[in-house]
């Protein structure tokens, strides 16, 4: 019985150790320097970068004010429900996803 308990504890420890080695999600990160994103983040080509250990989602926010379009892409701890809003000439798109590089398009 003692051996079974020891083996169970060992299995749990190994599982937790291997789980901690999993890679963090990788997201496209751009447009974070501008308050409303940047224009190059809309169509630029970027490599996905590793996010923080608590981040589980990639996010994308696109803003069009009628004259220019800007975007901001990055990492998030929480899910952002997809939304498309338009108010006069201003339109916004927000979304999140949870696979590597999924916020590229």
From Swiss-Prot:
Compartments, record wording: Secreted
Instruction: Cite the post-translational modification comment.
Output: Contains 4 disulfide bonds.
Q: Which GO terms describe its molecular function?
A: toxin activity
Q: Which Pfam families match?
A: Toxin_TOLIP (PF00087)
GO annotations of cellular component type: extracellular region
Principal subcellular localization: secreted
Q: Which UniProt keywords apply?
A: Disulfide bond, Secreted, Signal, Toxin
The residues the entry assigns to the signal sequence are 1-24
What else does the entry mention about this protein? The scoloptoxin-05 family has remarkable similarities with the three-finger toxin family commonly found in snakes.
* Family designation: Belongs to the scoloptoxin-05 family.
Name of this protein: U-scoloptoxin(05)-Ssd1a
Which organism is this entry from?
Answer: Scolopendra dehaani (Thai centipede)
Organism placement in taxonomy = Eukaryota, Metazoa, Ecdysozoa, Arthropoda, Myriapoda
